[in-house]
C-alpha cells in the first residue's frame, strides 16, 4: 500500500515536470501552426476555433477590440470537428482570398443568427494537411472542447484556458497574469 502511494506520488511529480517541457514543445509547435492573426500586441494567445462554434465566435468578439487597439495578438487556429460541415468550412476560411475577413464574417453571422454562413469548400491537399496538423496540436493541449486558448506568461510558462473567457479574465491575461481553467 505504501509503495503504491509512493509510486503514485512519483508519477504525479514526474508528469508535472514533463508537463512543463511538453507545454513548451506545444508552444513551439503552435508557432508553426496554420493560423489567422489579428492584432499586434505584446501578449500573444493562440485561440483554437471551429467555424460552427458559437462560443468561439463570442471569444473572437471579446478579443477583437483589444487586438484592434494593439494590446493583444490573437492567432486564431482553425480546426474542424464539431459538426459534419466544420472541416469543409474551416477549409473555406483558410482558402478564402482574405481568410481573416472570411473568419470575421462567419463569426459575426454566427453571433447574429446562430448559424455559420461560410460555404463549405473542398480542402486542397495543403489545407487538408494544415487542418489535420492543427487538430493534432489541439488534441495535444488535452482539450476536448472549444474554445481553447494557449498563452505564455512573461516568465515563459505556457498555460491554457478552456471555456468562455470573461472581460476580466482577458484583462488579467493582457497584464501578464495566468488564468484558472
Spans of features found by a protein language model:
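Positively charged n-region of N-terminal signal peptides that target proteins for export
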Residues: 1-4
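Extracytoplasmic thiol/disulfide redox context detector
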Residues: 6-85, 122-145, 163-181
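Conserved segment of the thioredoxin-like fold in thiol-based oxidoreductases
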Residues: 84-129
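A short, hydrophobic beta-strand/beta-hairpin element that forms part of a small beta-sheet core
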Residues: 145-161
Amino acid at each position: 500500500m505504501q509503495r503504491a502511494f509512493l509510486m503514485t506520488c512519483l508519477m504525479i511529480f514526474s508528469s508535472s515536470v514533463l508537463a512543463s517541457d511538453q507545454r513548451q514543445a506545444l508552444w513551439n509547435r503552435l508557432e508553426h501552426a496554420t493560423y489567422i492573426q489579428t492584432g499586434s500586441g505584446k501578449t500573444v494567445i493562440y485561440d483554437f476555433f471551429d467555424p460552427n462554434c458559437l462560443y468561439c465566435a463570442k471569444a473572437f468578439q471579446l478579443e477583437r477590440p483589444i487586438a484592434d487597439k494593439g494590446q493583444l495578438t490573437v492567432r486564431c487556429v482553425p480546426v474542424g470537428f464539431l459538426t459534419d460541415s466544420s472541416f469543409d468550412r474551416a477549409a473555406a476560411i483558410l482558402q478564402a482570398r482574405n481568410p481573416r475577413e472570411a473568419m470575421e464574417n462567419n463569426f459575426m453571422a454566427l453571433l447574429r443568427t446562430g448559424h455559420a454562413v461560410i460555404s463549405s469548400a473542398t480542402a486542397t491537399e495543403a489545407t487538408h494537411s494544415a487542418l489535420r496538423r492543427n487538430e493534432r496540436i489541439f488534441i495535444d493541449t488535452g482539450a476536448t472542447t472549444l474554445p481553447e486558448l494557449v498563452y505564455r506568461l512573461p516568465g515563459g510558462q505556457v498555460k491554457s484556458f478552456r471555456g468562455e473567457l470573461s472581460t476580466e479574465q482577458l484583462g488579467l491575461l493582457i497584464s501578464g497574469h495566468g488564468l484558472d481553467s
